[in-house]
Amino acid sequence: MNQRHFIQFRDLPLLYGRVPKVANSSIKACLYRLLTTSPEKGLRTTSDAFWSKGTHGETSMVDNHSARMCRGTHFSFSFVRNPFDRLVSAYNNKILELDDVPGPMQAMGLKHGMAFSAFLECIATTSDADLDVHLLPQSNILCLDGQLIPSFIGRLETMESDWQQLQRRLRQERLPTLGNLPEKNRRRGDDHSDVVQYFEDSGLVHLVADRYDNDLKLFYSDIDLDHLSRGLLN
């Protein structure tokens, strides 16, 4: 599994902790605007390879240790998502929509069209080291030794207001703002009504609550578990 979760800019004191299934493609499209030279052809901005190899050295992908070492000199940000909703999104996108399940998920034992309950049970019994990054706890991506690395964390559920707050923080840090957030790879949109249908079984709710306990405590401790498992954050 790729351990380099942060995009670091060479000429700007800026880091982005990328979390798959959390507007990652849209945010990368905004970061693309900060590049000063035309990138190499053949790589999509959505891929980590673009940021590690395709920008003529303007950006690199760094691990959590390197990202934390930059806390005193760089502004870092990221966005998180309700773990229940993130799992439903990953299941729909990677297990139901794709005929060929991605290799790392196949290695976990995940298969096209498998039942949602079996999908969750497989995740619950797979170690963090063997999880596909789309299923990795967000706290693993954004923390080191239990300490949060980014200085700004927004939520997908309040993306519009949090994105504006991020722009204000960037201006305060004397960094270029990122402009409007484009809609990229949004399949379910803002409709999270299907979350409750997937989590009608309280056993599945508790399975996810146990597996993603750190995410819930760190990013969503102010919201009741029942509301989260129904996709309700208000």
Where are these regions (language model features)?
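Membrane-interface amphipathic segments in extracytoplasmic regions
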Residues: 1-234
